[in-house]
Amino acid sequence: GDGVGILTQIPHKFFARVTKALGMDIGGEREYGVGMFFFPQEELRRNQAKKMFEIIVEKEGMEFLGWREVPTFPNVLGHKAVECMPYIMQGFVKKPVDVEKGLPFDRRLYIARRVFEQSSDDTYVVSLSSRTIVYKGMFLVKQLRTFYPDLQSEDYCSAIALVHSRFSTNTNPSWERAHPNRFIVHNGEIN
């Protein structure tokens, strides 16, 4: 498939549970931001990119809490999608005490993301927010929930869900080009 994804609210109960199992304390709802990352498969380059993000978060006055490997089932994918599949991880960032929840915190996360994007050209930040998260990839709609078992968890709850499937007419499919994007769902023709 050319790509599909889903944008939801951050499922706090789900993340509180899975991060606790990793020994991470993310705090209360909207007290943290979650980044979804497409890293290189090569361990050295991946570790360098992860370290760079951690440094940037600290330089922007926030505390990096830890990484989570996102569970996936690549066996449901086609050969081409598996060949170029990134290493998918989530990074957790603590909200500074002097920054309000919501938009003010998301602005800080936005700046950290933009600085990181300038420093790491082989990593794609799928989303980084204290309010929403995007799960996406180069596959079909029917494969989304199977590929990402997180989405099947009973405690993964959201009041919104924007799903978008991409059929490219003039570009090659890629993991990064799958929709939805970080803030918008569109057909590529904003006039």
State what each model feature region is.
Residues 2-191:
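N-terminal segments that mediate ammonia production and transfer
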